Amino acid sequence: MKLYKDLIGNSHDDLLTDRYEIKVGDVTFEVKTKMITKDLNVVVNNNSLGGSISTTVDNNNSITLSTNLEDEFENVEAAGTFQINNLVEQLRLVETSFDKKSYLAYMKLYIKDLINHIKQQPSNSDNEKIEHIQKGIQSFVKTMMDGENFKKYSFFTGSSMDANGLVALMYYKDDDPTTPTFVFIKYGLLQVDV
């Protein structure tokens, strides 16, 4: 299995695995995910708990012994269910928020840090490749911030909420409004075989 970790952030959070179908773009990974329903209700197996014991004394001084655990939970209400994204749950991603101005400021710093990191790698001394990566990321950011596009996105950090790390984007495509799609800057991910 391949695990993709945050390359730039201090905590190197897990952000993605190859358990998900990854569509490789020029500078991004795009991942279709799904919403799943989680049950908040607790199932109690009174056989494993052994039941509870309670005593009552009636007017005739008769003692009644009760060992039915269900009596103890008679007035407890069901907690219900909730929806969560399967990728968010599996990798403990944390939703955060940006307005256009703060996201643009974040991306300027992130791109700078990412390009500096890439330049420091001995295998990445090709200036044309570095320029291609930088322009590709800038083009992606420009497109996602254009007009009303920005409002379509939700933002997620790794579990440590590292402010220097990669922020994943989630949106719903116009042609597939029921499938949440995540977008990651692929050069900001470190692939690890586990």
Curated annotation (Swiss-Prot):
Signal peptide: none annotated. Keywords: Calcium, Cytoplasm. It is found in: Cytoplasm. Residues 1-194 form the TCTP domain. PANTHER family: TRANSLATIONALLY CONTROLLED TUMOR PROTEIN-RELATED, TRANSLATIONALLY-CONTROLLED TUMOR PROTEIN. Belongs to the TCTP family. This is Translationally-controlled tumor protein homolog 2. It comes from Dictyostelium discoideum.
